[in-house]
């Protein structure tokens, strides 16, 4: 019997979030094992995995030959190989692409649906988990393993934890936190990722963007010093020739409907509106505010006004918790 996801509640912004335990069903886990795992991943993703410590996790992109991302992966070491978390909607096609050259290497690449993905965030999240686990991850040690459980630490938008565990531990955790924590589903974690400026690549946007268009260079997800990987030439050209004119932005405001991944928005130009950008993700918060993650030109004026197409309501730019200055 699979672990049952929690019923949805309207997500809350990080500043007002009570202690919350989330089931992360919209995300999925995959692994690579075998003697050639590190070498294989080094030739496939934008990050320098050979430099990754056991207690580190990072966001890397897996690109096609043109440097466009199939997906981004939250990557960490796992046994003799690696595990990563990505949006469930892109896992199958991403693994198909990743496996294309695997026949020549000693690796096994597979989806993992045995483990349960949970998120813990909100008021005193660390204190709540400290009662359950003997050690918690932190800024200095971002990945901690305990038995069947791996805990990943995130700083933004406020301290939170992603837990990869077995069904028994997931049930135990739920039982222990049920009284003090709100239960919610993937939408709450999605809202936190949007607020943190972590790019969300779902199926609609797979194969559409180079990593820099989603700020991956600002998140430490691209190494410009490592050897060859698929799409490297285009990713390097975007940096060294200034070919990338796009960036990921956070918008907030009102909208009568939520824009979908892949949709464009409209930018106010004097009295008129002009189509712009590509939506990666959007969530409506419990206070009625809509937050939107969108890829647009990187030279937008900070006071620009946007809207969902033909809508009466407007959206404005919110600051991200990191700098895009290189």
UniProtKB/Swiss-Prot annotation:
- List the molecular function annotations (GO) for this entry: folic acid binding
Cellular localisation: Cytoplasm
Taken from the record, one Pfam family name reads YgfZ_barrel
Q: Which BP terms in the Gene Ontology apply to this protein?
A: iron-sulfur cluster assembly; RNA modification; tRNA processing
Q: Would you tell me the Gene Ontology cellular component terms? A: cytoplasm
Q: Give me the segments passing through the membrane.
A: none
The residues that hold folate are 27, 189
Per UniProt, the keywords (alphabetical) are: Cytoplasm, Folate-binding, tRNA processing
What is the recorded function of this protein according to its Swiss-Prot or TrEMBL entry? Folate-binding protein involved in regulating the level of ATP-DnaA and in the modification of some tRNAs. It is probably a key factor in regulatory networks that act via tRNA modification, such as initiation of chromosomal replication.
Q: Which family does it belong to?
A: Belongs to the tRNA-modifying YgfZ family.
Q: What PANTHER family does this protein map onto? A: TRANSFERASE CAF17, MITOCHONDRIAL-RELATED (PTHR22602:SF0)
Q: What is the protein name for this chain?
A: tRNA-modifying protein YgfZ
